[in-house]
Amino acid sequence: MNGKYKLMITKAAQKDKEKIKQYPALKRNVQNLLELISDNLFQNPPPYERLIGNLKQCYSRRINAQHRLVYMVYEEEKTIKIISMWSHYEF
């Protein structure tokens, strides 16, 4: 499951990315996480969790205490779809 994955960012996540640009520490954390999951999807640490309920196909990693990076993995296409980069599962 390792190898380079292509990142796809949803419109909602793109809006989140614009908000994050205002906060250098958040921006740096997001960039680091995006590079990490692109190169080594299930590297731990930093910890990730598989979500449940209507988000059961998604994974989450902590950006900071308040914000989470939420994404879906399409293994066959080697693609990661970024769903959210802001708040804590509010989408």
Give, region by region, the residue ranges found by the protein language model.
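Enriched for short, Lys/Arg-rich terminal
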Residues: M1-K6, A12-I20, P24-Q31, P45, ...
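Blade/loop signatures of beta-propeller domains
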Residues: D39-L41
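Acidic, metal-coordinating catalytic cores used for nucleic-acid/nucleotide bond scission
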Residues: L55
